[in-house]
Amino acid sequence: MDPLGPAKPQWSCRCCLTTLLFQLLVAVCFFSYLRVSRDDPTVYPNGSRFPDSTGTPARSIPLILLWTWPFNKPTALPRCSEMLPGTADCNITADRKVYPQADAVIVHHREVMYNPSAQLPRSPRRQGQRWIWFSMESPSHCWQLKAMDGYFNLTMSYRSDSDIFTPYGWLEPWSGQPAHPPLNLSAKTELVAWAVSGWGPNSARVRYYQSLQAHLKVDVYGRSHKSLPQGTMMETLSRYKFYLAFENSLHPDYITEKLWRNALEAWAVPVVLGPSRSNYERFLPPDAFIHVDDFQSPKDLARYLQELDKDHARYLSYFGWRETLRPRSFSWALAFCKACWKLQEESRYQTRSITAWFT
């Protein structure tokens, strides 16, 4: 009796078939996994296809819209992480199509002040969008400020009490030894210069000049005066010992490129007419400039400048600060990056009265 003998081949075939099916199933699963993994488009914030091992969520990049170019002159948009080390980058654009998505809108006052109701953004603003009022002009040259009230959340200007402080210039310490050559006094062949564009006969600066020039020769450049071809300003002004850094209007902190660029970059001693001496001394050493308020009359100022012209040691004393400090100047790109930094450092949302603050 051998009833099991004929059944062995049938059992072996079933076992082999089962094994083959299992291996086929494993192979299909493996190749399916490879295909999905290869085709998966996910890229994580760390730049790889795999999540950051720290588990830190990605920080969104603020989108900043420049509603207008300042003075309608486009400028190169910076990488703020390079311009302000330690600052994360922002997406900065002048393309108004992004207005509905923008985290912030910078409005330069000069371009919207003529017709605010038509020139300010008119579409509804998204929740949390912050508007930044921006001006480098004094209140005397900013029209229709009341029309700005109730719209803006942050201020950006030359005023030191702005939410975003953007001065026309500042001093910073040298890192190491001063990199500039000593003053070449022999190249200072002329005495006093003044470059002026807006000539208002009744303005404080023109009235003071008219009294001063009765006692002292002043070379005046600009409209209706001596020609100053573009690109020759520094070369021309560097021949002078003194420069009249007279502001077009008198307001706190309104100390403009007339001092920071025209005078200091030309290595001319600035003779200033603007805010008080104490206001200037918030930004400059007291022996870095001459203030008209230090003299009882323009005649006394003229006499003092003539004395300095003959006394080289006293004249050179106005440059002592340059051994430890150097002047730096404003740029639009830097202003935009300061706004970028502020938006990421502070989430405060408020509505300010521009009129109450600025005037």
UniProtKB/Swiss-Prot annotation:
Keywords: Glycoprotein, Glycosyltransferase, Golgi apparatus, Lipid metabolism, Membrane, Secreted, Signal-anchor, Transferase, Transmembrane, Transmembrane helix
Matches recorded under SUPFAM superfamilies: UDP-Glycosyltransferase/glycogen phosphorylase
Transmembrane segments: 15-34
Lumenal-facing ranges: 35-359
Maturation and modification: N-glycosylated. Proteolytic cleavage releases a secreted glycoform of 43 kDa.
GO molecular function, one term: 4-galactosyl-N-acetylglucosaminide 3-alpha-L-fucosyltransferase activity
Membrane topology reported for the UniProt record: Single-pass type II membrane protein
UniProt entry tagged with the keyword Membrane: yes
Entry-listed glycosylation sites: 46, 91, 153, 184
A Pfam family matched in the record: Glyco_transf_10
Catalytic activity: a beta-D-galactosyl-(1->4)-N-acetyl-beta-D-glucosaminyl derivative + GDP-beta-L-fucose = a beta-D-galactosyl-(1->4)-[alpha-L-fucosyl-(1->3)]-N-acetyl-beta-D-glucosaminyl derivative + GDP + H(+); an N-acetyl-alpha-neuraminyl-(2->3)-beta-D-galactosyl-(1->4)-N-acetyl-beta-D-glucosaminyl derivative + GDP-beta-L-fucose = an alpha-Neu5Ac-(2->3)-beta-D-Gal-(1->4)-[alpha-L-Fuc-(1->3)]-beta-D-GlcNAc derivative + GDP + H(+); an alpha-Neu5Ac-(2->3)-beta-D-Gal-(1->4)-beta-D-GlcNAc-(1->3)-beta-D-Gal-(1->4)-[alpha-L-Fuc-(1->3)]-beta-D-GlcNAc derivative + GDP-beta-L-fucose = an alpha-Neu5Ac-(2->3)-beta-D-Gal-(1->4)-[alpha-L-Fuc-(1->3)]-beta-D-GlcNAc-(1->3)-beta-D-Gal-(1->4)-[alpha-L-Fuc-(1->3)]-beta-D-GlcNAc derivative + GDP + H(+); a neolactoside nLc6Cer + GDP-beta-L-fucose = beta-D-Gal-(1->4)-[alpha-L-Fuc-(1->3)]-beta-D-GlcNAc-(1->3)-beta-D-Gal-(1->4)-beta-D-GlcNAc-(1->3)-beta-D-Gal-(1->4)-beta-D-Glc-(1<->1')-Cer + GDP + H(+)
Cellular localization per UniProt: Golgi apparatus, Golgi stack membrane; Golgi apparatus; Secreted
Enzyme superclass (EC): transferase
GO CC annotations, alphabetized: extracellular region; Golgi apparatus; Golgi cisterna membrane
Gene Ontology biological process: fucosylation; glycosphingolipid biosynthetic process; N-glycan fucosylation; protein N-linked glycosylation; protein O-linked glycosylation
Location of the region described as determines site-specific fucosylation in the Swiss-Prot/TrEMBL record: 73-112
EC id: 2.4.1.152
Keyword Transferase: yes
Cytoplasmic side: 1-14
Pathway: Protein modification; protein glycosylation
Similarity annotation: Belongs to the glycosyltransferase 10 family.
Quaternary structure annotation from Swiss-Prot or TrEMBL: Homodimer and monomer. Monomer (secreted form).
Function recorded in the entry: Catalyzes the transfer of L-fucose, from a guanosine diphosphate-beta-L-fucose, to the N-acetyl glucosamine (GlcNAc) of a distal alpha2,3 sialylated lactosamine unit of a glycoprotein- or glycolipid-linked sialopolylactosamines chain or of a distal or internal lactosamine unit of a neutral glycoprotein- or glycolipid-linked polylactosamines chain through an alpha-1,3 glycosidic linkage and participates in surface expression of the sialyl Lewis X (sLe(x)), Lewis X (Le(x)) and non sialylated VIM2 determinants.
Listed PANTHER family: 4-GALACTOSYL-N-ACETYLGLUCOSAMINIDE 3-ALPHA-L-FUCOSYLTRANSFERASE FUT6 (PTHR11929:SF227), ALPHA- 1,3 -FUCOSYLTRANSFERASE (PTHR11929)
Protein name per the record: 4-galactosyl-N-acetylglucosaminide 3-alpha-L-fucosyltransferase FUT6
Species annotation: Gorilla gorilla gorilla
